[in-house]
Curated annotation (Swiss-Prot):
NCBIfam families per UniProt: PRK00197.1, proA
Family: Belongs to the gamma-glutamyl phosphate reductase family.
Name the record gives this protein: Gamma-glutamyl phosphate reductase
Predominant place of localization: cytoplasm
Annotated CDD domains: ALDH_F18-19_ProA-GPR (cd07079)
Cellular component, GO annotation: cytoplasm
GO BP: L-proline biosynthetic process
HAMAP family: ProA
First-level EC class: oxidoreductase
InterPro entries with a match to the protein in the record: Ald_DH/histidinol_DH (IPR016161), Ald_DH_C (IPR016163), Ald_DH_N (IPR016162), G-glutamylP_reductase_CS (IPR020593), Glu-5-SA_DH (IPR012134), GPR_dom (IPR000965)
Keywords from the named record: Amino-acid biosynthesis, Cytoplasm, NADP, Oxidoreductase, Proline biosynthesis
């Protein structure tokens, strides 16, 4: 392992002891102070962010994710306050029982330990990760991408200065250099890092999963579908589809494929009409193309190719698939889903129940936009990522997902026969 990285991780591991001694009320006060400092230094944050943005083309899909403006920084500070106000997730009694032999057994929540998060062009993640890890008693190792290095470095400075004002060991948070070559040593840090969470492209997630010797929770990649059923309400559908696709195209809960029942193809032009106002390019299968031809801007309408399905666009692009029934819709989703977020628009309760029961995803929706798959929208304050796996955590990962548990047994001298 790289010697410098190993030393940083050892220092971080040692800092878990100091972090565990901080009282819950103190953590809350520190997080509220951090939120105030974010607001106080908005102009400085934007200045550092502009340095990063100047090195990226505005047409790059990552540009929007990298951008921090006043509105987003204020929202970020508000998210920190929400995390601060959440109940303490540690020391929660999950189970308690008295055994016939007199033993008292409790199962209580504890921190995971040292959490490493590898992420790319979203500097807001730096603050989200720290606030959640700090509140849940975990040391955090931050491995941001080079495209956000100036912004991440300044945000880390704000965090460390806030901690210093309370005489807190600043080793509880660490920002590793942005070089990709350092990812492998981090993934090999058995005994020093308790969990790694990759947030970013599918290539990054695949690399981490395939090369890690430490535990990993997969997050991020979202190939998102919305199925407009035979019984779907047209007005609801128009609003939901537009919101899921165009609210923020660069996020993992954005709509990628619209699936439509063949009996409702006549309504397709109206369903997607507002998308043309945002210059959304549609990749339509044969049936959908025939309906949209002359009913959607010619320059924005393309014939779908096989690779357009099962693709996370992260852009103003949408694939459309026509199906004869709900079973075919579910089959298509199960073939191409990344198990992130899937939605149905329907008025038929039996269709809704079938979809919600049979579709395998971290979040399944009926008559609502997939844009809601978010820690803040789920009342978690913020999220460290959206898990697309089933072990330990699934969906938006808030404070509870950053804890484990231990068994506490009290006796009066009992021995086992």
């Amino acid at each position: 392992m790289n010697t410098d990285i190993a030393n940083q991780l050892r220092v971080a591991k040692k800092a878990t002891t100091d972090l565990n001694l901080i009282q819950s009320d103190t953590r809350t006060i520190i997080l509220k102070t951090l939120a105030a400092n974010l607001e106080k230094h908005i102009e400085n944050i934007i200045q550092e962010n502009q340095k990063d943005l100047s090195l990226m083309l505005e047409q790059d899909p990552r540009y929007d994710r990298l951008l921090l403006n006043k509105e987003r920084i204020l929202s970020l500070a508000n998210d920190v306050r929400k995390v601060a106000s959440l109940p303490n997730p540690l020391g929660v009694n999950l189970l308690e029982k008295s055994m016939p032999n007199g033993l008292s057994i409790k199962k209580i929540t504890v921190p995971l330990g040292v959490i490493a998060v590898i992420y790319e062009s979203r500097p807001n993640v730096t603050i989200d990760i720290f606030s959640l890890c700090f509140k849940s008693g975990n040391v955090c190792i931050l491995k941001g991408g080079k495209e956000a290095h100036f912004t991440n470095s300044y945000l880390l400075l704000l965090i460390k200065n806030t901690l210093k004002n309370f005489n807190i060991n600043t080793d509880i948070v660490c920002l590793l250099p942005p070089e990709r070559a350092l990812i492998t040593p981090l993934l090999n840090a058995t005994g020093l890092v308790d969990l790694c969470i990759p947030r970013g492209s599918q290539n990054l997630i695949n690399f981490v999963r395939d090369n890690a010797k430490i535990p990993v929770i997969e997050t991020g990649a979202g190939i998102v579908h919305t199925y407009f059923d035979k019984s779907g309400d047209l007005e609801k559908g128009k609003k939901i589809i537009n919101n899921a696709k165009t609210r923020r195209v660069s996020v993992c809960n954005a709509l990628d494929t619209l699936i439509i029942h063949a009996d409702r193809l006549k309504d397709l032009p109206e369903l997607v009409e507002t998308l043309s106002q945002k210059n959304v390019i549609i990749y339509a299968d044969q049936d959908a193309y025939q309906v949209l031809d002359k009913n959607y801007p010619e320059q924005l309408l393309m014939k779908a190719k096989p690779q357009d399905f099962g693709h996370e666009f992260l852009d103003y692009k949408l694939a459309i698939k026509t199906v004869p029934n709900i079973k075919a819709a579910i089959d298509h989703i199960q073939q191409f889903s990344s198990y992130h977020s899937e939605a149905v628009i329907a008025e038929d309760e039996s269709a809704i129940d079938k979809f919600l029961t049979e579709v395998d995803a971290a979040a399944v929706y009926a008559n609502a936009s997939t844009a809601f798959t978010d820690g803040g929208e789920f009342g978690l304050g913020a999220e460290i990522g959206i898990s697309t796996q089933k072990v330990h955590a699934r969906g938006p990962m808030g404070l509870e997902a950053l804890t484990s548990y231990k068994w506490v047994i009290r006796g009066t001298g009992q021995i086992r026969d």
